[in-house]
Amino acid sequence: MQIHGSGMLMCPYFGAYVEDIDPEHINAIGGEDWFSNYYDHTDGTEKRYDNLYMNASPMLFPSSRAADVRPSAAAIEGMPNNKLDFRYVSHRIYKGKPKFDCLPYVRDELNEAETLEITVRDFSKDIEVILSLSVFEKYNAVIRNTVFLNKTGKAIWLKRAMSVTQDFPRADFDIIHFPGEWLFERQFRRETLAEGTKVVASSSGRSSHEHNPFVMLADKDATETNGEVFAVSFMYSGSFRCETNVGKVGVTRLTMGIDDTHFKYEIKDGKSFEFPEGLIVYGNRGFESVSHHLHDIIRNNIVNDNNSSVYRSVLLNSWEGCYMNFDTAKVLEIIRAAKSAGTELFVLDDGWFGKRDNDRCSLGDWYVNENKVDLKKIVDECHATGMKFGIWIEPEMGNFDSDLLRAHPEYAAVDVETDPWLSRHQVMLNFADDKVVDCIYDSLEKVLSAYDIDYVKWDHNRTLEDYFAHNLDGEHQDEFYHRNTLGYYRLAKRLTERFPNVHFQGCASGGGRFDLGTLFYFPEIWTSDENDPVQRLFIQYGTSFAYPPSVMGAHVNDCAVTGYKTKAEVALFGSYGFELDPRKLSVEEIAELNCVTEVYKKFHDEVVMDGDMYRLISPYDGKAFAINMVSKNKKKALFLMVNLLKRLRARRFVKLRGLNPELKYVNSFDNKVYSGDYYMKVGVNMSQGLNEFQSRLITLEEVK
């Protein structure tokens, strides 16, 4: 970090540890920049800052409209001159890191981080920014925390809020991002950066199926195990924007923060605005090293303590088995059949509340439909089998045909006079209004208090574009997206604190809100509504670059493309369960599933929950997919290969990674014992014939 002679904050270098840094050497680009000169109004003369190039120098918190045409960190409206030009005021260093009251944050209960807190100010307006850079050395991670303070004497409007701004004195990067859609989320995409600005964004009010608030910049020749990689993740569940700008002199600026398409936030005099946190993780041993750091910081410092290492019970969800067509007798039949299939947790999905027999009514009416189900009897009998019990909710949504919106039409975040668009026949509730959040909390608190519920699936089945907040005037409508996200966090915080032993799973039509903000409150997220195992290979592969398998909901359904063995073995590398009617399973199919379920129960805690993942063959290879996971103590491992093309006569060895080279391991394929060194240098012999979409799961355990 450098305080330039101008008072501007610079970050000349970000990367592997270096003992000595020469900022002047790094900043020098040769030649002369017209924007190094400035007019000093105090004496009416032209002056020059040495070694300052406004369009090229590596700024820590780039100003707005201050001769730097690259993307800025912040922008305002409401002043006679909206230029922002921040200069250094003070700094301090302390152990630990800051927290938020209303936003998720990276936890540091053990004070492992060291924080550099810097105050900068626009002296012409008296706007201050407190920048906190918290370093977790063991994760190679820097957490950016920003507070924007208005001391101008009048209200201003914040129009841009970028939580991460990082400059690099180079332009030879590939960018890796993860576009997708419903049923095909987070697909791996690698592109070469070129001059101009590359944008990855969501403007739909949530982090979205289409893009994820996570990108990587990497050496052009970076692989899983080699090359420099810079990963940036945004801890936010609303709309986001990431811009990667390659400038005219070969420098790169990456910014990530709140999308400004529907964002303009009033900050009154004396008040502040907290930017959501952003993370930058560095690795110089390829994508694998960055993923391992991200997986560890999520498990240890983001997922809450009550759930970070809790065993994920084998789950059966009722949705694909019976949809909303059930009564008490049918549910009890399914529970008994689920038990015989090795299930440890039964989740009753949509249809248990209000008058909900179809998706056109009753969202918002969170009381049990006693004419349809005897929920107490169901819960008690489920527990009597030794299984846990869970329910589905969608707190942020409503139907016009509901008691809630008949009594309070203003709770809907729409203007009915404009013929608002519906999605799944529903509208978004106005979670920018505390009264609405309180109302939903009260009704859900009653249900969770009245029944012995172990698990809650929290869904979110539409985007927010067609919005109108009745509690906000026209001038403040563009505050809705952010206020609505804060309302989501407020309800999640209240419910998880009120019911600390209830396991919450996040969901948004599958993976439409898969982000660090959600993981702060919920220890797992439903990865995708797509359960086809071949499609899931691509989805879970892409997701794994940023998120550990322990937070990925991964289930088996009854699609006809592959057998249950392949489905179950793919789902094993996540929070495992079933989406089917267990009454329809044959004895042979139950036996096939039970074989994989037993592996899950034996290996999940040490290997999948807490272990390290190694991506061996990408599904984009087109021929096969392979991964292995290894426990932290290196004593257990799982290996999975899925064939994508029929190969009957091919010599094929897959080299594992992450084992202890000196330990001996017995494998479950042929019961032979080899050293970790052998498995990693020679590999597992996968030369036997496999048809397309057939899989091979092999366990490895230490032998002495």
Specify the residue positions occupied by each region the protein language model found.
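Aromatic-lined carbohydrate-binding/catalytic grooves of carbohydrate-active enzymes
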Residues: 307-442, 455
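C-terminal beta-sandwich/jelly-roll accessory domains of carbohydrate-active enzymes
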Residues: 645-704
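Glycine-rich, aromatic-flanked loop segments that form ligand/cofactor-binding clefts
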Residues: 39, 49, 53-97, 222-238, ...
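Short Pro-Gly-centered flexible turn/kink motifs
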Residues: 88, 265-284, 693-700
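Glycan-recognition surfaces
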Residues: 399, 403-438, 482-584
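Conserved, mostly hydrophobic/aromatic
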Residues: 146, 270, 382, 504, ...
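Polysaccharide-binding surfaces and accessory modules of carbohydrate-active proteins
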Residues: 5-245, 261, 664, 668-670
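Carbohydrate-binding surface patches
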Residues: 215, 224, 618-660
